[in-house]
Amino acid sequence: MTSTQSSQEVLADHDTVGGDNTSNKAKSTNIFLRLIQYHYRVTKYEKSEEQVLRESKLLPCIPFNRWFLIPAAVIIQFCCGSLYAWSVFNQPIDVLIYGEVVNMAPITFYIAVGSFGLSRNGPMVSCLLGTTLFVVGNYITALALYLRLIWLVFVGYGITSGVGLGICYISPVSALQKWFPDKRGMASGLAVCGFGAGSIIFAKVQLPLYNNVGLPLTFVVLGSVYLVLMVLSGLVLRTPPPNFSVGSDQTENGKVVEAHANGDPPDKISLIDALTSNNYRFMYAMLLANSIFGLVVISRLANMTKEIFGKTPDEGATVVSINGLFNLGGRLCFSILSDYIGRKNCFIIMLTSQLIILGSFSTITTTQTYWAFLMTMFIISSCYGAGFGVIPAFLSDTFGATNIGSAHGLILTAWSLAGVCGGLTFTAVFNAYRDGAHPSDPHPYNINVWWIFGVVFLGWIALLFVTPTAKDRAFTRRPRSFFRSIINRITNRERSFEMN
């Protein structure tokens, strides 16, 4: 390829990647599987020398460095993190449109989450497309609030912005997994911790902004801020050049070649084999279970602090901000921790913690123990955020970094399912038990907890069947080796004593 040729996107050859068995499976007559295979097909980019040279510079006078991607990814995720602060708008939107609180606004949050997991066409172009949709969705929401049309709010924020959020969420994560094959856990954690940071800041900014300019103009101002920040950050995103390497980890044409230094590399399998494997199914159930309670809590946390515990709206917004800090901390700390103790072990900690909290939730709310409520909610938020920090590295370790973009995008539909089905179910049950009840009565929340407990328990069972990664196996061997060494020392001393 000469330097004058343009960059071409070429469909990866599944036959050569997966072997004869993969080829036969890829050519399945199952129409649904073939549609998935086409929609989430593996692609590679063959870059011209001209493009490689151009992308080697961030600016004409500044050479590009892979670490520039970290702040760009954090800023993009930071803007997307405003989704987590949506609960601040629940009551103002209901009052503006209906004149009273009718619990319709939270549904927009669930629809927005349900739009995640869509396909992309490369980090920079995808991010700019997602930004356009996200910003336009905010402007449509402003128009909907001006006209007082709740269905247009659903279309604007729930669908249009939701699709844009989904595209912008995955683009930097996929790029960082390719640029940082030596630090997958850290890279995925840094990429998504901006989401938590966004919820902290926007939860505090949105309420004063609404009080000063009104609800419709709030979305106009926010949309304009998103436009500037996300476009500038999106222009930084790119894929690695051909044969990019870091230590013993190498990429070819932007595709990562696994290194034995990071553990046993996964077999070279096609994307369709990865998506239809038992491991992927169990991981899907695992992520859904880890997401469902966190989604419900985040969208109603401000309401619970005000209704059950009688706190002020300002304190409710503060709690949402602090909750976002724990969300951020969970994403970053667990993802880094997973580089040492393993991805599966981290998910075992997350789901077990949630089961314990769900079992004690009714007691905490009934007795109105505020400090215990805050502690459990912050732990739930940490575990919820941690799932999104660990899952990209978990997928890379299990199925290979070549498949990470599409595998990550599709598995986020588990989050969508938890948001839509779980959120709407929660709302239906909540409204049914809320009729005639006092606003401070926690029973509508408590009754919902038990079906969520069942979902999380099933996800915990599914997690047990997920194949552990090399890091998981190495970590579980350490305690055995430690105790074995102690036993050997004691045995050797006894033998030495007997000989003497």
Regions found by a protein language model. Give the residues of each.
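Cytosolic juxtamembrane N-terminal segment immediately preceding the first transmembrane helix
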Residues: 2-80, 263-281
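Extracytoplasmic gate region of multi-pass secondary transporters
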Residues: 86-93, 272-334, 388, 419-426
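Intracellular juxtamembrane helix-capping segments at the cytosolic ends
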Residues: 93, 165-180, 187-188, 301, ...
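Helix-to-loop junctions at the C-terminal end of transmembrane segments
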Residues: 113-123, 331-343, 430
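C-terminal ends and interior cores of transmembrane alpha-helices
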Residues: 132-146, 353-366
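Hydrophobic core of transmembrane alpha-helices in multi-pass small-molecule transporters
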Residues: 137, 150-167, 288, 371-386
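Helix-loop-helix hairpin linking two adjacent transmembrane segments in secondary transporters
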Residues: 195-244
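C-terminal transmembrane helical hairpin of 12-TM major facilitator-type secondary transporters
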Residues: 283, 293, 308-394
